[in-house]
């Protein structure tokens, strides 16, 4: 097939799809039909290209990576695919001839409801780079019918509604009903020894659910490779019960199907109750069981044996959600292919690798042992055996130290620990920034590091720089093309050449003009969607990340309240106008995160009611923040808020997207901020607050938030005003949370300890903004230093040091 059709050929392809799929001509087609027809033609090109690439991989006998993650935050596909394939211009011309505007069609596509935050966006960026670099790769996740949720803000309160994305997004999915697999839950397990010496595993009263794959193609930029993202939908194996239906028992007739299909309805269901925990566990096992069965089937079709699995397959666990792939692969090798335990374990531990994404204790997943045993009886038996053998190994390493061994065990204190089995069953364990990897070795997994020092590695995260710079910010990309050529599009380290222009006033002025144009575009989008007016001459100060206490949107809010009170006291105060922009979703069961959202929304509402204050201070909370919204916002941002409590953020990638688009960072020495400072220089980033070591020492010595409160008049004023509140609502509960939490330590993420440093650093940043030449120079140098943080670099490191992949072109 022709992978690079010209505009005439594209026009013919679209007209053909319109006729076959919708029975209409271009003149009769609606905008939605034209979008879907366009998407189908692109999907067909990608599918053919994928088939050709897969044939090359099979002929080469190349090793493949299978990347498992509970979420992939893809955003929209049409624009990225057209740019990656080099077809954007051809499609634009073809659609113009057909009476449609390509930009309008981009707006028809919903963001794919397959992800939530940084974990899913990282997975999406990595799939993009794997394709662009010609590495054989398949991603695995679940095809969530209703995504995470669609966020609505009603009177400042987050309301979760279903994210109905499939009507517009399903056009990118190819159902593979010929590749379904059975996944078993519950029941009882019996062992029956056969005369030939092998043990047959029998299941009684188990619930069987069918996993149906839906494939999405992931394009690469100017590459031979097309990666595949395989998404699983749950379907009941027991067909519709006609007998019950004819008796009028309609609900009962469909009950089994409904119960089975719940597994693939929603990403991260609330786990504040037993039912939610069971559903999450079911989702995780459903994902890994279907995926491992698929991997084994594909491998056997090419090689006919499994002894060579580690040489031909790399299975990567992205965080602990897919950790059950370790016992599931053991189950298949031992139960279905009759490998000895020792041989099977050798294969597993040379095939699987694990990336840790958090040091937060609540995110290091564990499951109630009784619940786990009831839901996954065979997997529980295997996990117990893994645990017993590991404990014997650990005893030899740490004789007599049962306390240490019990902390390292997979099963202990009534819990089954996913992080521990991930470390034990993987040949590589990596963190996602230098600081994070050090914390893993020195604290989180320190005992494992003593036992397996050779397993631990670091691969700092990266972003799909073509998407976040070239496609999202075409004005800046055009300037870079003129100044340093186009090599940076495929070799992002070449961005460093842009630093040569730091003292070129003409280039600095163009950087500033491009930023202002992007601010105008974003403000226009916000006004059209919400009616809210943003002053494009104000500083765009941006904090965009999921709402969590450790990310400290609350610290940002405290500073905003201080500015609000300054203006309330003196409306004529000379101040650089500032617009604070937030994009964040709170987990449905996370009450404090929801209160912080309400605080931000009420501050915004209060400011809207005070026109004099709004001239200099504005707060914008973006409802239902998404990837497509980020693509408009990030190029317009001038200040990037990366203010997590030091030692809590593993890496962060939003900071990298903002940096590569010329925003200046205010942040703690946490996550990737440390390496960003090294890359751009301390003089071009605004660092404040406690370090990770200082945070640890403060905890050990006894943190008392009240000490910081009583010694800071500005803080006293701000926190007292929380009780007065905004737009008629008091936030005395947040004041209490900061000062005298009745359920633990007050101010657990040290907002008060870091407040003065944050306030002074932010003030210095606004002062620097007044000197346009200095600010634009710093902005330019941030762009030039951002090449290190491209996903292409991350993937090359994974491929070389962890997966052992070779490129297939």
Where are these regions (language model features)?
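A conserved ligand/cofactor-binding region detector
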Residues: 1-809
